[in-house]
Amino acid sequence: MQGGILCTPDLRTNSAIDLGRARWSTPAMSDLAPFAEDTRRTELEAAQAKALRLFDAIERDGLIRPGVTEREVQDRIGELAAREFGVEKHWHKRIVRSGPNSITIAGDNPPDRTIEADDIVYVDLGPVFEAWEADIGKSYVLGKDPQKHRLVADLPRVFAEVQAHYRKDPGMTGAALYAFARDAAAAAGWRFGGKIAGHLVSEFAHALIPGDKALYRISPENPTPMSDPDGKGRARHWILEIHLVAPDGSFGGFYERLL
């Protein structure tokens, strides 16, 4: 609980964005200096830790509060990330979704709305720290609604359950892990809101890794082992996304971290 707001507990996102369509004014991945395989996970974990500190600063400054629009919060987060963390680019758009917009996924573009006093709000950020992508999703309850509090409390618990299942068998397919995540959400009393349950993350930009992009997502369309190497022959590093939605579709919450 911070400033009277309950937020998703940390364990130290639904992206339907077509990453293949993204463009950046940066060198292609093939032009970047290669990174040693044994350091890549360490660097991604360091980027995630920095992103979590960015969330700490967002909460410190009270950016998520009633009376401001989602777009205003997105803009202020961008300013904060640049000012205090030196973030010059984000590999995906900054996402703030509140109230009925909290059931939407990253690829949606719902109308901007003003955050209200009893809202649930989720934030999904993809800052790039030096060469490394982070991807963090976190949810907040602004009021006292017990169902919203229960959903936000369930997010990291369901995440941990799905993560533990994967770690028992890293060779499972993306489709199998998606199905498990969907079933875990249902067992907790929620709908699984995402078309995917995660995706690759890497040196910026993972969208430039060669190969079929469907195989780089945790989704029903990925029948291949998640332990397979990527299109450059390297280990794949995954983000796990948990998007829980109320059975009546009135609100949802989002949580993501490295798998």
Model features per residue range: what roles?
Residues L6-C7, M29:
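Extreme N-termini of proteins with methionine-enriched Sec-type signal peptides or N-terminal signal-anchor
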